[in-house]
Amino acid sequence: MTYVLIPGAGGDPRYWDLLVDELHARGHKAVAVPLPAADPDAALPEYADAVRAVVDTHPEVVLVAQSLGAFTAPLVAAHPAVRLLVLLNPMIPAPGETPGDWWTATGHAEARAAYAAAQGRDPHAGVDLAVDFFHDVPADVAARLIDGPQESDAVFVHPNPLRRWPDVPTRVISGRDDRFFPADFQRRLAVDRLGVHPHELPGGHLLALSQPRLLAETLLNLTG
């Protein structure tokens, strides 16, 4: 079994480096896919092509998708090699929904503001990478990745070709300390859109950086 890892916004495969090391140490194959996120002409079909090219080279695959990667993963999950789809702190799409429409459709802004207020943080503050994403990531790791590649607008505005969720077992893993996609918000979305309850781990939005060992163990438990 090979774990094929789809990054979130920015398409940076380095996000998965620590998890890849943990999976390799346990005797498992893992491949992180670079996405053409900076290409202004690349959107979900091109992202799916990049992932599919990797999946094509492995007989049995677990697809693992971080955040925005949850829009790409279901476009590839019908591939005959895919045995399981795992979504990590995901933007779970509805069929045909674009990533740009997802924010309003899911009530994300309200959920994020409510969680910030409950924690004593400013509910009206703009997105801050250090506060919202890297707050629980070791400083040396954050220093390497916080200024990673940017995402072009194309993926947010171009059509989403997904017409139905693929007939592949799907699991959701969420960080119970995620400040960007709060755990309550993720629970609601996973149940409403997939009919599944997330496996919750301690940690924020970037679990592969803050909890790589625990995440590796969780993935292995999910895949038997």
Regions found by a protein language model. Give the residues of each.
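Conserved HGGG/HGGXW glycine-rich cap/lid loop of the alpha/beta-hydrolase fold
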Residues: 1-40
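Glycine-rich His-Gly loop
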Residues: 6-9, 67, 90, 175
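Active-site loop/oxyanion-hole signature of alpha/beta-hydrolase fold enzymes
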Residues: 29-62, 100-108
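Short beta-to-alpha linker loops that shape the active-site pocket of alpha/beta-hydrolase fold enzymes
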Residues: 34-38, 91, 204
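Gly/Ala-rich beta-loop-alpha elbow adjacent to hydrolase catalytic centers
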Residues: 64-69, 73
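Flexible "cap/lid" loop of the alpha/beta hydrolase fold
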Residues: 78-119, 153-160, 182
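Conserved alpha/beta-hydrolase catalytic His-Asp/Glu region
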Residues: 119-164
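Conserved serine/cysteine hydrolase catalytic core
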Residues: 151-213, 217
